């Protein structure tokens, strides 16, 4: 039996089409995925992300533990509330999960991890935390709502009290603050400004209803996927998994190589991969009729005349741009064009950076 978030009833009241998403009943859309997508790009939309797992870590050696556990370096986090994005790797350099970590104090950090990898993540974190004496608290008492879009912060702020409005005033991206019973973070998965707000389960439904009344459009998993793909953001299980290096998933920027003496899980394997080279993640654009879909082959000939093949990891029609886009994992040496096999047709595609839309505008 699939689990339900505390907002399940609100979704049905809003007319959602519900689907099983990694063991959770979640809204796919509320009538029109395209309208929901455009609402986030032009105004304000919201997503129930209560299926994601919030994990609080406490103990005097928490920073030391996370510097070992994660490929990115929490030594960078010195201001309370600051967050960073990181891969959590296995010994062979594969990605167990990608996550966000928040720093509150030397003995208190918070992780937000994916729902699909929950049990695996918790087992891995618990196993490696033991020698460091870390107290682990899974915050199943909290729901989470992502409010995203150019008007999202202003509309969400109409629900905040004076202290909460003051707490978020001027807050830069990738920060989080506990203000009363709300944890408000300037993070998201759409390429737009917004907040991800964690709050007690029993208060989630009222907050959702108030956001609807404030003019924030409920959005489902369908729009969440097209928005994140336009923004060039990875989806675990597609762009990366335990067999794929972060270097092959456009996550090289999340690996803190310095200081050279910091030992983190997967470092040795990554150093070997960096030396020998890996595949890379690129963007693909197809302006001709048709849709680039997951797992279609991508073929190209390199400058030496050698033929290579990669694979589309995520593909869709872009509602913002009006044509098809994709992320693809390909061998090094790809040029500015490639061929994608769609059924029995060879379709030309343009190779781009793996990001297509930022703040509602096409990335040239």
Swiss-Prot record:
Catalytic EC class: transferase
Molecular function via GO: aminomethyltransferase activity; transaminase activity
GO biological process, one term: glycine decarboxylation via glycine cleavage system
This protein's record includes keyword Nucleotide-binding: no
Reactions catalysed, as given in the entry: N(6)-[(R)-S(8)-aminomethyldihydrolipoyl]-L-lysyl-[protein] + (6S)-5,6,7,8-tetrahydrofolate = N(6)-[(R)-dihydrolipoyl]-L-lysyl-[protein] + (6R)-5,10-methylene-5,6,7,8-tetrahydrofolate + NH4(+)
Keywords of this entry: Aminotransferase, Transferase
Highest taxon of source: Bacteria
InterPro entries, alphabetized: GCS_T, GCS_T_bac, GCST_C, GCV_T_N, GcvT/YgfZ/DmdA, GcvT/YgfZ_C, TrmE/GcvT_dom1
Any one annotated GO CC term: cytosol
Keyword Transferase: yes
Enzyme Commission number: 2.1.2.10
Subunit structure: The glycine cleavage system is composed of four proteins: P, T, L and H.
Task of the protein: The glycine cleavage system catalyzes the degradation of glycine.
NCBIfam families, per the entry: gcvT, PRK00389.1
Family statement drawn from the similarity comment of this UniProt entry: Belongs to the GcvT family.
Name of this protein: Aminomethyltransferase
